[in-house]
From Swiss-Prot:
Organism expressing this protein natively: Blochmanniella pennsylvanica (strain BPEN)
Pfam families, sorted: tRNA-synt_2, tRNA_anti-codon
Keywords, in A-Z order: Aminoacyl-tRNA synthetase, ATP-binding, Cytoplasm, Ligase, Magnesium, Metal-binding, Nucleotide-binding, Protein biosynthesis
GO BP annotations listed: lysyl-tRNA aminoacylation
Top enzyme category: ligase
UniProt family annotation: Belongs to the class-II aminoacyl-tRNA synthetase family.
The name this protein goes by in its record: Lysine--tRNA ligase
Amino acid sequence: MTKYVYSKDQSYQKFNVDDELNIRRKKLSKLREKGVAFPNNFRRNSISNQLHKKYAHTSNVELIQLNIEVTIAGRIISQRIMGKASFITIRDAEGCIQLYITSNSLATNLYDENIKQWDLGDILGARGILFRTRTGELSIYCKEIRLLTKSLRPLPDKFHGLNNQETKYRQRYLDLIINENTRKTFKIRSLVISEIRQFMKKNNFMEVETPMMHTIAGGAIAHPFITHHNKLGIDMYLRIAPELYLKKLVIGGFERIFEINRSFRNEGISSYHNPEFTMMEIYMAYADYRDIIILVQNLLRSVTQKILGSNIINYGDYELDFKHPFTQISIKEAILYYLPETRSQNIDDICTAVSIAKSLGIKVKSCWTLHRIHMVIFEEVIEKKIIQPTCVTSYPIEISPLARRNDNNPEFADRFELFIAGREIGNGFSELNDPEDQKERFLKQAYGKKNKINNNNVHIHYDEDYLIALEYGLPPTAGIGIGIDRLIMLLTDSHTIRDVILFPTLRPK
């Protein structure tokens, strides 16, 4: 097996990986013989980025006068060996810094011995004095340097290595070592989730945790993953949504709650779907879906400003505006707006709606209602046209089993979905708190629709325990589920969900 790696003089050469492994293993064997392989008694007092920031405006003359000694550690990413002096660049979690090593600063025999043993990818610990090179680069004149971890496998170089996307996902650790943009993406992800938590705390929401294993696959319409509890002797389901447990907590008196956690759906994999994904759900008592829209607007405005420094962000060719209130539009209004040719037609006539759908290449089923036809036209044709943050309302009650009916038009739910850059980011609604209405809808879901799981017909979405809880009284409540991974895609200008999940689901090799 061959691959491209950097040589010590920074040229790039073709190596046989097995040969390189053998060479590095021999070096490790020598370290073991000396009893210095993989030491764990080195401590650092500095991080590269902190040093660069703190001494950004300090001249070399001032640094020499200050005589600042630091200890630092990181992975070798480049080496320049010039006889009795060498420059080595190491990278830690925050950035890079250059080490300057000479046979004068270390004993000559120690210098020669160390340089021969080090390879790209090795992890070093160093102690030395800060100075600037002739080119002005902040560096460390090393008094002591130690090999902390020997890397047995050569790193791919930045030009030829990890061009295969699947390799990046399968060996994410290599992607993180080599690709600065990947590291930046996941740092932003962490900051975004942290800022979301801070925002929710400031708005008096309590973070909670609900079960990951359910005895009933409820809370959403999706295929679950099935597992088995040996002691209880029952099948259980990895949760497809935490919704019903969270609403039980609202019934119990927690009026403002949220959860950020994983959900699992045994369905397709695509650029916007991963079977294991991170979702945030928010529930607020004494509120309706319009209050949730305002909350989410403020949340995203805060996150974009604090993490990215602006409410206007770039995503691909689009400039997304989180500064102004989100557009609100019904499904019917969206059809008329994005398909101007339909404005002269009566789309409330089912025959006309069928004709429009067929003209768009949609195969219409005879059992579909008018609202279902509108919904499919929207999903198949309109969604991808919505670029700016937009709350789409007036969803049919028939596809909204947990949402409250609209008072003025009971055929529709008090529900909205948030679309940005052509994709659904969130789904929110005023919660159904009428236990008898909820029971009727559960029955329709459970006995009107069956899923085949493990070759058995399994009735879905009938949760008697939730109905009992609902009979104790759920206050007027609204909630939303937000796809965190999709949100991170927007905020990092990523175009596949795999780029924002550290270890996405892959088929085994």
